[in-house]
């Protein structure tokens, strides 16, 4: 079978390991997403893995889908994870334990709102590399951010007291991987990542449910354990790096082969 990787970085550890597993019996092609839909011309893989989130990458994914090729994750599912306002609306509407989220057209408008309770988590509305994710303990923090981020559309979430560790849940197909990462919002000295982690009862099923709600096959779910012990989802990411998780490349290779085989049978 023939697999396609949509990525500017085929040497990424997850992709490189997956490609190595497939290369013995299958062809693996790399499509750089910079060319957008034009890169779909002549493309003939049985399945494509979308490890990019730029507008050009999504344009390429949509072009491949129009041609009948399966893309993991789909362009639509990937886009759902880029708008944090829509993400929260979808998750809360489906009954997922997602952090309550407010939207502001700009950080400057947030600064003018009089009804904020502190501390507050402020994030860029559009999820992307090097976006804004910060905990603020009062209005002074907003003023410090204004020169760089004043025009940035943002969302806010109330800061939920927690241990300072993010539970990272990664899903590939029906397999759930997990680890602990020191929260970027935590105070105090940085600590090394922990993992793998034994998840509390019900958390693995919660992660799989997120995939069904968002239409995702390869994704990450950021969860914090509230003081009462219950899970609170604070972010969902399409096709994260899943670094250092034993078995993740094998799970991704198996998923790609299943999707490719299903596509061939459907022709």
Located regions from the model:
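Conserved N-proximal alpha/beta basic substrate-recognition cap immediately N-terminal to
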Residues: 2, 7-100
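Short, well-ordered alpha-helical microsegments
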Residues: 14-15, 56-59, 110, 142, ...
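A short beta-strand motif that forms the metal-chelation/ATP-contact edge
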Residues: 45-49, 123, 169-171, 229-244
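Short glycine-rich anion-binding loops that position phosphate/pyrophosphate groups of nucleotides
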Residues: 53-55, 126-127, 239
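Hydrophobic alpha-helical segments and helix pairs
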Residues: 81-130
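A short linear hydrophobic-aromatic micro-motif
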Residues: 100, 119-122, 154-157, 218-221
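Phosphate-binding site of ATP-dependent enzymes
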Residues: 131-214
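A long amphipathic alpha-helix within ATP-dependent nucleotide-binding catalytic cores
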Residues: 186-233, 237, 247-266
């Amino acid at each position: 079978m023939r697999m396609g990787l949509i990525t500017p970085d085929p040497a990424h550890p997850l992709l490189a390991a997956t490609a190595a597993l497939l290369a013995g019996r299958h062809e693996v092609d790399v499509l750089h997403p910079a060319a957008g839909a034009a890169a779909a011309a002549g493309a003939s893989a049985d399945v494509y893995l979308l490890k990019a989130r730029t507008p050009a990458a999504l344009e390429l994914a949509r072009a491949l889908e129009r041609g009948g090729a399966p893309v993991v994750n789909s362009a639509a599912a990937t886009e759902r994870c880029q708008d944090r306002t829509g993400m929260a609306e979808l998750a809360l509407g489906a009954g997922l334990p997602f952090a309550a989220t407010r939207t502001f057209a700009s950080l400057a408008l947030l600064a003018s709102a009089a009804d904020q309770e502190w501390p507050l988590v402020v994030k860029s509305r559009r999820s992307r590399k090097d976006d804004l994710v910060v905990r603020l303990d009062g209005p002074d923090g907003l003023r410090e951010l204004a020169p760089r981020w004043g025009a940035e559309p943002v969302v806010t979430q109330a800061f939920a007291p927690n241990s300072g560790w993010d539970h990272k849940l990664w899903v590939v197909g029906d397999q759930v991987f997990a680890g602990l990462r020191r929260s970027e919002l935590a105070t105090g000295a940085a600590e090394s990542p922990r993992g793998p982690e034994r998840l509390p009862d019900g958390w693995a099923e919660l992660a799989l449910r997120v995939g069904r709600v968002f239409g995702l096959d390869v994704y990450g779910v950021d969860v914090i354990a509230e003081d009462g012990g219950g899970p609170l989802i604070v972010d969902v990411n399409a096709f994260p790096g899943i670094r250092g998780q034993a078995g993740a490349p094998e799970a991704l290779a198996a998923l790609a082969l299943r999707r490719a085989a299903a596509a061939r049978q459907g022709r």
